Amino acid sequence: MNELLTLTAAELGERIAARQISSEEVTQAHLDRISEVDGDIHAFLLVDHAGALDAARRIDARIADGEHLGPLAGVPLAVKDLFCTKGIATTASSQMLEGWIPPYDSTIVTRCKDAGMVILGKTNLDEFAMGSSTETSAFGPTHNPWDLERVPGGSGGGSAASLASFQAPLALGTDTGGSIRQPGAVTGTVGIKPTYGSTSRYGVIAMASSLDTPGPCARTVLDAALLHQAIAGHDAMDQTTINQPTPAVVEAARQTDVSGVRIGVVTELSGQVYDPQVEARFHEAVEMLIEAGAEVVEVSCPNFDLALPAYYLIQPAEVSSNLARYDAMRYGLRVNDDGEHSAEQVMRATRGAGLGAEAKRRIILGTYALSAGYYDAYYGSAQKVRTLIQRDFEKAWQMCDVLVSPATPTTAFRLGERTADPMAMYRSDLCTVPANMAGSPAGSFPIGLSETDGMPVGMQVMAPIMADDRIYRVGAALERLLHEKWGAPLLAKAPEVRGER
């Protein structure tokens, strides 16, 4: 494998700035890697070869002219195909957006371009980000680089798989109920869900607007922090963004000392549905943090048990509202538009043909939850539970600085294993949903491999609102401790993907 592929984003940025290497050669190396292995992985839906190389050359020219750019200038970036990209097709992995090319960039894509990052292309996801395995994509599933017969998590499996297979050093994701953290956990990469409202949703195709949170995906904690710093901040185009300074995430990622940090282990996020190997790796990681000087206590958050059922009422309710905009009248797919069918018939036929089974399931569930006679019993009750979960977090912060749990109940399951059982699929989000319900920041960090199936295991770290830096501090400590134990990053243990399929 080309050495440029294994360098961290921080290392690439430093060498590009020092003109030891060029952005063009780094970008070309990643494009070559995509051509070599993505037939096996299917992380990308679209690769912008010409656009990426052109952007890289422009960065090289600016550096040659003496401009001092940011720490990620010239570094390639994969973008989840939920972010609008001007002049580049954006599909949300759905047939409904067939042929649609956005006339503008999302705020976060704009910020990445302003920071000098080079967009390689758009990555695969579950349709409209609805799923936990990247199997509901209209364009086929993504495969886990650790085992091509297993899922890479979801919804953002494409972004995580692109990192784990060394096709990109950085990626953008979105997290509504775990769609950054869960893929990170099962692919051995780092995934961060920032505080809700600290990253702009403008230009991100909406799924559940009170939960959707864009965030960084990377192979190292520092790389995630550098990307986080580049994309976060208030945006006048998104009135839900928080007008406060971004926490010092990069400084925290460089600090690997956890002496005196109070860590709470959530008692409710364990039990029979958890793989014993996942729990074993989790408790080993907790012991390492204790040995490093952290203070660990058990914390009860009783309403976390209600988070998953409440989430799967609130999220579909918002889906049923957001997806109503796809009416075949203005853009995207249009079926039976032959002059002989009414607008209502065209709309019905288009939605029937363009939306997948999971999208339809959640629209129906959400519409039912919002319907007259059921609103208070379902949606209203779920919102009350959401408040109780927020109170659980508030009580927890009186006892500890961060909360930790396994990032997922199991390791990556086999492709097709849960597609016929929606409830089993939904349980993949058991650990991650509470943070979304509260708007709290959370991250997933690799902590080892299952001795049963050899697949990665992740630890989740949660922090108070706008205390994202605490996540990076604990994550950086974990990374250092485990690198010392293993002698190399976890991904060094991953099997080589050779592009033979």
UniProtKB/Swiss-Prot annotation:
E.C. number(s) listed in UniProt: 6.3.5.7
Active site (record annotation): K80 (charge relay system), S155 (charge relay system), S179 (acyl-ester intermediate)
Annotated keywords: ATP-binding, Ligase, Nucleotide-binding, Protein biosynthesis
Gene Ontology process terms (BP): translation
InterPro entries, sorted: Amidase, Amidase_CS, Amidase_dom, AS_sf, GatA
Any Pfam family the entry gives: Amidase
Signal peptide stretch: none
Broad EC category: ligase
Gene Ontology CC terms: glutamyl-tRNA(Gln) amidotransferase complex
Protein name as it appears in the record: Glutamyl-tRNA(Gln) amidotransferase subunit A
Species name: Cutibacterium acnes (strain DSM 16379 / KPA171202) (Propionibacterium acnes)
Gene designation: gatA
